[in-house]
């Protein structure tokens, strides 16, 4: 009887581990405590356009969605908790089209995040909304900013891949942790 309980427990553990590894909903560990909210290099405006990553050397882009926001993703964008992009050509397109108009408003309940990791191991993060009618970012520094190239960004987000590991650790290794 004791042997059956051990075998059953082991099989249950293996099944749960398999689900955790392959379901597309990893555990996300983030380090917010050392976030520098005052990086003046991010806030330059060119002709009323705000692009906080235009001059950054980006290694990867990570989208972390709240469970509620996953249901609101537009058609074609993979409905998973974490999407990632590390393809250089796609990152370059993204940098060129990640342009926003600052509205001066505030979006109250933005729970999803976009996280940019640079080649210098700096981390840039801000809250993001991606749904059928909107792409926008929300930060303490600039408030709500609406995407100027939403259609192009939708196409880029459709090419992001599902993060397949069970844990995602977002921490600046020897770099800085900043809000966009």
Model-inferred region functions:
Residues 2-9, 16-180:
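Function-determining sites in protein domains
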């Amino acid at each position: 009887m004791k042997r059956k309980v051990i075998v059953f427990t082991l099989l249950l553990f293996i099944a749960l581990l398999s689900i955790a590894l392959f379901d597309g909903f990893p555990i996300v560990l983030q380090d917010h405590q050392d976030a520098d909210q005052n990086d003046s290099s991010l806030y330059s405006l060119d002709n009323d356009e705000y692009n906080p990553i235009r001059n950054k050397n980006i290694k990867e882009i990570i989208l972390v969605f709240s469970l509620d926001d996953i249901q609101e993703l537009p058609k074609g964008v993979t409905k998973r908790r974490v999407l990632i992009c590390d393809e250089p050509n796609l990152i370059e397109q993204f940098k060129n089209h990640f342009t926003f108009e600052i509205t001066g408003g505030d979006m109250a309940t933005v729970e999803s995040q976009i996280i940019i990791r640079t080649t210098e191991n700096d981390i840039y993060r801000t809250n993001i909304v991606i749904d059928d009618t909107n792409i926008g970012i929300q930060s303490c520094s600039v408030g709500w900013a609406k995407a100027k190239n939403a259609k192009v960004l939708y196409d880029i987000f459709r090419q992001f891949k599902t993060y397949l590991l069970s844990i995602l650790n977002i921490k600046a290794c020897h770099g800085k942790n900043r809000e966009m």
